[in-house]
From Swiss-Prot:
Residue ranges, Cytoplasmic side: 1-22, 88-97, 152-159, 215-285, 347-352, 409-456
Species in which this protein is naturally found: Neosartorya fischeri (strain ATCC 1020 / DSM 3700 / CBS 544.65 / FGSC A1164 / JCM 1740 / NRRL 181 / WB 181)
Family note: Belongs to the major facilitator superfamily. Sugar transporter (TC 2.A.1.1) family.
Subunit comment: Interacts with creB.
Subcellular location: Cell membrane
Protein name per UniProt: Probable quinate permease
Length: 542
């Protein structure tokens, strides 16, 4: 079987897998480039001697430096938390396309404010700019996965939402290396540290330009009663005529889902809030989605992203440039493994198995790194060169990255984008994204203090949380791979959880055969002037 082979819930014409759907996902994913770049560059920028001298870090105590650094990093996450909720009314009333434009505009304004900061003006503009930039990326982290999942065919939904994660890693790769580049090529100066801040404007500018040409989400248009526009956009995205049997099936499924929502949750801005507070099924799924981000942040990945110099110093690396270079390698490993996840793992192995394998492997690696720090105590016994034990610890650190990246890095975003019915999706994604930024804020705010107080215990702490996440996934989280968005209710109601996927997929295949049989019995055999493709081959087994 080809590495790019797809698992389909029903026979899918090859026209559906066209360049348009990938282009739309790529343009929308400039939001994740913004997020990835910021999460990667800020830690090493704060470590640049030019930045520390201009803002007086060299005259502060270590405790004060840790506090100011944590405030600079974490005010961005605080803004993102509120931005995730702000995106709900924007996405509901304005649509997904205008929500993306809103996200890019707010981020660009914040990035511009940061460029006005200097030693004379102090850190005020930096704080304000990072809060605004956080609002922008918080909104983008809500809307982008929804936009992509609502357009994607089920068989490549994981891959397309994975483009969002790929954008995150590409932005991160640039962010991890840029400070190494400026530290090697430029003398310490205002210019040296301002360049990394200025680069933030590139992905936000590309988003603002590209989003103008995006097609609005057909599912959002259906929910707003704009049926003609919805069908027109869906036909453009699928490259199929409206009377093709595949389109009839998809439009019928959307109509049926909307009718069920009218009869249960109801359509409208406030209805999801009522359901979230009174419907136990919705509350349970919100709990699952939010907990996914608790476990993701509990892996320690954002402690590494934001404070990589501190992390590598705890292992025994000496010198700012050495830490920046090691951070760059960390970014390369994450990006390469993300490609493997995107092209092969997410829609072949599925979400659930990836999370289980990733948590098991990553926890072992973290325990080993923590044990090395406990035994060797590199902070108290510094050496000019890495010892054999230190090299082994670095190996297991990068191996941790290999386990974590194709599992917990992007998969929670994929699952949260597909777990909820259309009228709940915006609010649910807002809650999930806000949950991510809340845990992200706690990690970014307290990581310096944790390393100062706990030392090797930090590694054991994150490893233990990853072990606990295995129990959570196995007993509570069903596999969502290849399941249409309109069938998620049936998936989460099926028991036992570890067999829910195969149960629902078998039911969908039966419904598909019955639908096509009814179509043939009714005499429907043409689409326009062309014969309908009666795809009779069996669906792939999962």
């Amino acid at each position: 079987m080809s590495i790019l082979a797809l698992v389909e819930d029903r026979p899918t014409p090859k026209e559906v897998y066209n360049w348009r759907i990938y282009l739309l996902a790529a343009v929308a994913s400039f939001t994740s480039c913004m997020i990835g770049y910021d999460s990667a560059f800020i830690g090493t920028t704060l470590a640049l001697s030019s930045f520390r001298e201009e803002f007086g870090f060299n005259t502060m105590s270590k405790t004060a430096v840790n506090l100011v650094s944590a405030n600079i990093v974490s005010c961005y996450q605080a803004g993102a938390f509120f931005g995730a909720f702000l995106a709900y009314p924007v996405g509901h009333f304005w649509g997904r396309k205008w929500g993306l434009l809103f996200s890019g505009a707010i981020f660009t304004l914040g990035a511009g404010l940061m460029l006005g900061a200097d030693g004379d003006r102090g850190l005020g503009l930096l704080y304000g700019g990072r809060v605004l930039a956080g609002l922008g990326v918080g909104a983008g982290s809500n809307i982008t996965p929804i936009y992509i999942s609502e357009m994607a065919p089920p068989s490549i939904r994981g891959r397309l939402v994975g483009v969002y994660e790929l954008g995150w890693q590409i932005g991160g790769l640039v962010g991890f290396w840029i400070n190494y580049g400026v530290s090697e090529t430029l003398a310490p100066s205002h210019k040296q540290w301002i360049i990394p801040f200025a680069v933030q404007l590139i992905p936000s500018g590309l988003l603002l330009i590209g989003a103008v040409f995006l097609k609005e989400s057909p599912r959002w248009l259906f929910s707003r009663g704009r049926r003609e526009d919805a069908i027109k956009n869906l036909c453009w995205i699928r490259q199929l005529p409206a009377d093709h049997i595949y389109m009839i099936e998809e439009i019928g499924a959307v109509d049926q889902a909307l009718e069920e929502q009218r009869a249960t949750i109801g359509l409208g801005f406030w209805k999801p809030f009522k359901a979230a507070g009174t419907n136990k099924k919705v509350m349970y799924r919100l709990f699952l989605g939010s907990m996914l981000f608790f476990w993701q942040n509990g892996s320690g990945i954002n402690a590494i992203n934001y404070y990589s110099p501190t992390v590598f110093k705890s292992i025994g690396l000496q010198g700012a440039n050495t830490s920046m270079f090691s951070t760059g390698i960390f970014g390369v490993v994450k990006t390469v493994v993300t490609f493997v996840w995107l092209l092969y793992l997410i829609d072949r192995l599925g979400r659930r198995l990836l999370l289980l394998i990733g948590a098991a492997g990553a926890s072992v690696c973290l325990f080993i790194v923590g044990a090395y720090i406990k035994i060797a105590d590199p902070a108290s016994n510094p050496t000019q060169e890495m010892t054999g034990g230190g090299i082994a610890a670095m190996f297991f650190f990068y191996l941790y990255t290999v386990f974590y990246t194709p599992s917990w890095n992007g998969t929670p975003w994929v699952m949260n984008s597909e777990m909820f019915e259309p009228n709940m999706r915006s609010l649910a994604q807002a809650c999930a994204a806000a949950s991510n930024w809340f845990w992200n804020f706690l990690i970014s705010r307290f990581t310096p203090q944790m390393f100062a107080k706990m030392e090797y215990g930090v590694w054991f702490f994150f490893a233990s949380l990853m072990v606990l996440s295995i129990v959570f996934v196995f007993f509570l989280l069903p596999e969502t791979k290849g399941i249409p968005l309109e069938s998620m209710d049936a998936l989460f109601e099926s028991r036992p959880i570890w067999r829910a996927h195969e149960t629902v997929l078998a039911r969908l295949r039966e419904d598909e055969e019955r639908f096509r049989h009814d179509i043939e019995e009714s005499g429907y055999s043409k689409t326009g002037d062309q014969q309908v493709e009666h795809l009779s081959e069996d669906l792939p087994k999962v």
